Amino acid sequence: MSNFIPLNCKTHYSLQKGFCKNNLLASKCSEYGYKACGIADLESLSGAVDFHQQCKKNDIKPIIGCDFDDYLLFAKNKKGWFDLINYVSEPTLDNLKNFAANGNLICVSNKSNGFKKLFKKNHFQYDHKKHQVYYVTEDESDCHRIMLCSGMKTTIKKVNKLISDGKEVKNKEFFESSNFFLPKPEDVAGDFEILNQISEMCEEYEVAEKPMLPTFECPEGFEEDDYLTELCRKGWKKRLMSSNKIDTEEKKNEYGDRVKHELKVIFKAELSGYFLIVQDIINFVKRKDWLAGPGRGSAAGCLISYLLGITDVDPIEYDLIFERFYNEGRNTEDHISLPDIDMDVPAEYRDDVIDYIKEKYGEENVAQMITFGRLQGRAAVKEVLRINEAVSFSEMNAITESIPDEARISDQLELMDEKSIIKWTLENEPENLKNWCIMNEKGDLSGPLSHLFEQAIKIEGTNKSQGKHPAGVIISKHRLAAVCPMTTDKSGDPVAAFDMGDLETQGHVKFDVLGIDLLSKIMEIVNDA
């Protein structure tokens, strides 16, 4: 059997270049008998945390790397993981020299080009462009080409015409060959001792961390739990006693028991700091005489939020349940779930609020976060039809309008093993698509466009673009570029390059600051009155 190890896999976080999905990549590696697998996305670590978690589920050793075109870098250990994060955030020559000297990164390049001198025994000269994996199974090659065409803003027919005319075409190799899939070990000829050496040099380490809340500066003599309790006492007097809400012994006991229960849960989860940070931000907004939202979503079910002035809704008065907001049953020894309180502020003052947070916790410790635009349902079908030039524009619109918005069927999708809007439509509203595609009880597709619907189903969930989350702000106790890969938005402001779920896995704490136009309009009306 071959000693090949797939170390240069490109996931769909290599936007519109790679197509590997981490869950399928890890499960296929397990099925094929691989003991290790590596990813090296294009100047990105955005998919690394999810890849690591998927490999662990499948008993595969995860090897995390990054592709800088002329060379690959792999993390040898946890220190190397943080060195790689630092370098991806700031890929300068000085940083490369410094991190090479640390000895925790492995460099792979086709030519020496000075890398051997920098990395010494941690450098391997190897053609890293060979045996790249851009999609997991051979039948995904068409989907990969769809994503390439999407990035190139062209169609399959136009690319094939250019190739047949002998013209130069970007990504030409992927249109001429379907050999960029994950091979079985026995199908790869050659000696891959270098790949095995790299794999053996890379240790296994954890990327998941417990929540790393920034330290809230309490008044002298107070710890966070004590200060939260003190603020609850003040809120009790201000919001309950002054309004006669606890004018009977029964009511006093009801409110008292609720506060004690909520504090007990919050103390156990070590989340006092979270509430102190949120109330401090809301207090800043109110000191500026800006409107703050009265409380939206499940946060209105927390009495402590009401006592602290974070929300203006009394959960007991409206029979709102604390466990809808925070359920300690979701916590495990290895994972503490985080609360989610939306802080609504006038849209034009959102940047001022974020500037206040940066001033308080440090410019380098605060950033907004990335979000990925994924092809779902209608968008996936439309992309496939457009790039294949399969139907007229009007028919394409008729097809996509027959597929429901994700929001309308979100509850039903949660019950599906494979959350596919297209499959849900074919199964639950078959009349909508019967002229183009039909799905039988076994899940097989038929109809004039069935092969294109198969492509669209495979493409669902694929990253197409990246942007900035409209609300999420990360506040860290560390310099973010040292613990989280960073990118920038169009204005050059720092953006954390892990998505929301991966940031939480890594222990980063998200605070939602939403700019609400309606609050701006209300302020305008009040000020003009």
List where the protein language model places each region.
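Alpha-helical scaffold/interaction cores of sigma-54-like transcription cofactors
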Residues: M1-A529
